[in-house]
């Protein structure tokens, strides 16, 4: 099953376990957010929203908040000794799609546990 969602003015086709970068969404890293603007649900019986599907949502886990690549805007007026250079970086949220929910259901999957690196055992015998 797939869904077409809209967030930040853009549309994304998603399936469970997809990882995607979207415009900044409020939420702590590791929490589950619900994206409510579902434009289409696909599968055995596709549903099209007019403009959205009532009661449908997509649950996603926030993996990271970061900044996108630098975009430089440069304008030059020839022979006028005039130029302007500006740059900016977008705020980006990295999401992992956990579930596609229809008919107003609540997400059943909680955030995944964080991986803990195993610490090496102390080498007490080697020091003696």
From Swiss-Prot:
Gene giving rise to this polypeptide: rplU
GO annotation terms (biological process): translation
Listed Low complexity bias regions: 119-128
Organism of origin: Rhodopseudomonas palustris (strain BisB5)
Gene Ontology MF terms: rRNA binding; structural constituent of ribosome
GO terms under cellular component: cytoplasm; ribonucleoprotein complex; ribosome
Stretch list, region Disordered: 104-128
Taxonomic lineage of the native organism: Bacteria, Pseudomonadati, Pseudomonadota, Alphaproteobacteria, Hyphomicrobiales
The protein, known as: Large ribosomal subunit protein bL21
Pfam families in the record: Ribosomal_L21p (PF00829)
């Amino acid at each position: 099953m797939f869904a077409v969602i809209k967030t930040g003015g853009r549309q994304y086709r998603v399936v469970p376990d997809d990882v995607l970068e979207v415009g900044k969404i409020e939420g702590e890293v590791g929490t589950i957010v619900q994206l409510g603007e579902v434009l289409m649900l696909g599968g055995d019986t596709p549903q099209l929203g007019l403009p959205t599907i009532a009661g449908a949502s997509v649950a996603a886990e926030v993996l990271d908040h970061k900044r996108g690549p630098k975009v430089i805007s440069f304008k030059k007026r020839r022979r006028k000794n005039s130029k302007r250079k500006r740059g900016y970086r977008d705020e980006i949220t990295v999401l992992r799609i956990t579930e596609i929910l229809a008919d107003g259901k609540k997400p059943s999957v909680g955030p995944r546990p964080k991986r803990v690196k195993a610490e090496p055992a102390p080498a007490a015998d080697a020091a003696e």
